[in-house]
């Protein structure tokens, strides 16, 4: 039975950038990695209602620079920048180095896989029918220009006794094509019947610019065989 590799992991360094961009020596690598994980978990918990898409971390010269991608930057920044200053102090305390916080707005949340997955999870927790939530997410993404989208939910759907998985797809989602820009995310909805897992794949088009294109060489014409004897 065929298994699916993580679409983001297999494209790292090809068409997908890394979420943490820094270099460290062997003795500092583990502590930096642990710090990144703690910072992400803290921001994910703190910014639950801010439609958090992703967190990009850089570490220039004994400091940390965190870029928060969100669909609701006003919620993150707060009144006169008070909330973002609290976040900066908290991140600095967790990482143990001076911190800088940047906010990047997600213009089309319907085209962001993480925000779509979180939205479906939120609807399932509010007892919205799972098929309606899936179909609405697919229609919104296709309306805003996605080339294809696939949504899968699994668990005790509708309170059924036996867990199952259901998916809905529209357009094309070429997971084998490495130049395809596939946005992938997972989320979990905690319902009264148990945990519902949500997976979202969004195909936004193909990325050609970062890949070296080979020049096409015309094939040589086959030589015609003759049976004539030399005179």
From Swiss-Prot:
Function description = Binds the lower part of the 30S subunit head. Binds mRNA in the 70S ribosome, positioning it for translation.
Q: State if Ribonucleoprotein is listed as a keyword.
A: yes
Per the record, what is one GO cellular component? cytosolic small ribosomal subunit
Which ranges of the sequence are coiled-coil? none
**Domain KH type-2: from-to ranges:** 39-107
- The organism named in the record is Colwellia psychrerythraea (strain 34H / ATCC BAA-681) (Vibrio psychroerythus)
Key words, A-Z: Ribonucleoprotein, Ribosomal protein, RNA-binding, rRNA-binding
Question: What are the recorded GO MF terms, alphabetically?
Answer: mRNA binding; rRNA binding; structural constituent of ribosome
What CDD domains has UniProt attached to this entry?
Answer: KH-II_30S_S3
- What is the name listed in the Swiss-Prot or TrEMBL entry for this protein? Small ribosomal subunit protein uS3
Is Transit peptide found in the keyword set? no
Record's Pfam families?
Answer: KH_2 (PF07650), Ribosomal_S3_C (PF00189)
Q: How does it assemble?
A: Part of the 30S ribosomal subunit. Forms a tight complex with proteins S10 and S14.
Q: Which GO terms describe its biological process?
A: translation
SUPFAM superfamilies registered for this protein in UniProt: Prokaryotic type KH domain (KH-domain type II), Ribosomal protein S3 C-terminal domain
**Similarity comment: family membership:** Belongs to the universal ribosomal protein uS3 family.
